[in-house]
Amino acid sequence: MNVMRLSKDSVAVGLSWLLTGLILLLVCLFSALIVRDYGRENEAARQTIQEKGSVLIRALESGTRVGMGMRMHHSQLQTLLEEMAWQPGVLWFAVTDENGKIIAHSDPRRVGESLYPASTLRELNIGSEERWRRLEQPEPALEIYRQFRPLNGGGHHMRMMMRRESADLRNQAPQVIFIAFDTRELDADHARGLRNMVIMLCAAGVVMAATVLAQFWFRRYQRSRKQLQEATARKEKLVALGHLAAGVAHEIRNPLSSIKGLAKYFAERTPADGEAHQLALVMAREADRLNRVVSELLELVRPAHLKYQSVDLNEVITHSLQLVSQDAASRAISLTFTAQPALCRIQADPDRLKQVLLNLYLNAVHAIGREGVITVAVRECGDGRVKVSVADSGKGMTAEQLQAIFTPYFSTKADGTGLGLAVVQNIVEQHGGTIDAESAPGKGALFTFYLPVNGQQKDEQG
């Protein structure tokens, strides 16, 4: 069953990662297509205007050739510019000489003025191919320009007529033609396209973020589910063990009471210095020890019913240290604790916490033997938890001992039951906390447990 469950969980995790990867890949491809299409649309719109400008320039050159054939020259060119300026989207036409002086303009009032300085014309690198640039003044425009060549082209009859033109016409200075197109509609389309692209990219980003969050929450759900399954299995085992322990305890405690009673009876009726008296006392002590083992076993397997209340850990630690102060003083062991006045109060069972601390103190006292230090510290972690640590200067533990320290019935003491730290771990976990230990031979031991500020019994969470 566990193998099948593990296999199903592994398949679910693998599919979740595969689905997440596919969604992220599709979102990236979709975003790339959006950006590419946006660039293509802008380039297509600009290319359309440029082709329109090229057609108008060739038409103007053709009309000018006809005018030359009919000996109309500049008047015909001016008339053509004024007529063609009425084309949709055209702001103005202009033909200049190589120095930027206007020869013809769609606005006849500007003829003879300077359109651009000669230095600007040189910077434009004007040639036989159409070029373009954006203008912002006096209004947004796309300007297309190239050399104006009305003498080139035409059929055989036109070329024969051009040969008969005067020498000054054929050898005239280079001219440049400019066409300015209104780009307000183009800019509006560009802005709409940009806005749509941003909206689509934001939507893609939301999908990507939602996918990542879904994966995060799914992984969190998987972890919570696994923890719940483990807690349920552990609880079922503890319940079964509890029933067994309760039955065993009932069967053991009754004869133990009889044995202890008989041991005391014989101890009272035998000489104090006799062997029988000593044997009777040993029997009584062993009966007490066995009864204590049974009690600790029941406490370990019985679900804890915590009585939550607002607890000041400073007070709990101080009171628990007072309970072991005489035993520690008799062994020349100093107890160190600095209260934290700003420490927040937590929701916990104070009696159970004292039981945890007393178990840790007594283990530390036993590990030290004589002359040493037990240091207790408490602080807030900043993540909704409080950290409590108990350190001693005892003989420490090996790595093997440290690994088994919370295992029931494992003890480093000859007379220990091996249930103390198991009970400690159980109480801490019932509070929704965790506990761990650090130690090395000759370097003492450090036990640290974390408790949630707003405690809730672990079984209730499940």
UniProtKB/Swiss-Prot annotation:
Enzyme class: transferase
Record-level GO cellular component terms: plasma membrane
Activity modulation comment: Activity of the ZraS/ZraR two-component system is repressed by the zinc-bound form of ZraP, which probably interacts with the periplasmic region of ZraS.
Compartment annotation: Cell inner membrane
Topology, Cytoplasmic side: 1-14, 219-462
Matches recorded under Pfam families: HATPase_c (PF02518), HisKA (PF00512), sCache_3_2 (PF17203)
SUPFAM superfamilies (alphabetical): ATPase domain of HSP90 chaperone/DNA topoisomerase II/histidine kinase, Homodimeric domain of signal transducing histidine kinase, Sensory domain-like
Post-translational modification: Autophosphorylated.
Residue ranges constituting the Histidine kinase domain according to the UniProt record: 247-455
Membrane-topology descriptor: Multi-pass membrane protein
The name this protein goes by in its record: Sensor histidine kinase ZraS
Gene giving rise to this polypeptide: zraS
